[in-house]
Every structure is written in structure tokens, then in C-alpha cells.
């Protein structure tokens, strides 16, 4: 399950992949900007397990590449700052990994290598859907935090994930 907790009085949004939490329901926000994130491999450090998304993509959108920084892993505590929106306008937002993530995809297995634009619209970018972050069996919780959010504004988060596998 995916949960985003934007607690009142806090400028951070924690995205958790373990449990769903009840919280205050915010009014439907007006979308003023979109940010895209490609969680996956840096081809330089993990050849064959996917590639970062080249900007702009075929739809004219810009992506923030959140990639591994230690072999097949993205270390806990890593901060990805200087995030930009889909039009390549800089934002004040940052994303921090609260736990270690493992990368995989492409020839390493499991990613969606031929995304369907009719189903995924702007998310149908093979470099974004073909690799991914995941938790290993020994890990029971992984999360990341968005910071520098405005507590007086609403935020929508959409996540796409896939894995070609016969087991969970």
C-alpha cells in the first residue's frame, strides 16, 4: 500500500510502502505543477538494469531521476534536491530516502519494458517503467520523505509500479 502523510504543522510528506494510515482528508487541490520521478538504475553503476530517463522525454516532459548510488542500492539518508517540475522549472522540494532501496529492471528482470500510452498516458516512458526500486525479503518497511512542502497547500501523489513475476 502507498500512504502519503502530510501532517498539519509539518513541511514534509512521508511516502510509506508498508501500511495505510487514516488521516485528515484535504480538499481536492488545483494542480499547478506536475513532477515526474523515475526510480531506478543509473546505467553507469548498474549496466543492464535500466537507464535514467533522458530529458525531455518523447512527450516533452522532464523527469527527476532517483537512482542508485552504491552498487545495486540507493542508500538511506540520500537526499535528492534540486527537483524540477515537468516543464523543467526548479522547485524547492527535496526527496530523502528514509531507508535503503534496491534497484532492478530491464535485463535484470521485472520492469514494464513496453508501456502502453493508451493505458498510462504520460507515464508510458520505457526508461521510467522498465526499472524500479524495491524492498528485499529481509526488509519490512521502506519509505522516503518529500520536504519543503507548504502545509497550506494540497498535494496529489500518483504512483505506478509493476513487476513481471510469478511470485510476490
Give, region by region, the residue ranges found by the protein language model.
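Short tyrosine-centred short linear motifs in exposed loops/low-complexity segments
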Residues: 1-2, 153
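Extended extracellular/luminal ectodomain segments enriched in beta-structured repeat modules
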Residues: 149-157
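Short, surface-exposed beta-strand/strand-loop-strand elements in extracellular ectodomains
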Residues: 144-146, 161-168
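Short, flexible loop/turn elements at secondary-structure junctions
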Residues: 41-43, 150, 163
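Short proline/glycine-enriched turn/loop motifs at strand-loop junctions of beta-rich domains
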Residues: 10, 152, 163-165
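Low-complexity, Gly/Ser/Thr/Pro- and Asn/Asp-enriched, turn/coil-prone segments
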Residues: 3-137
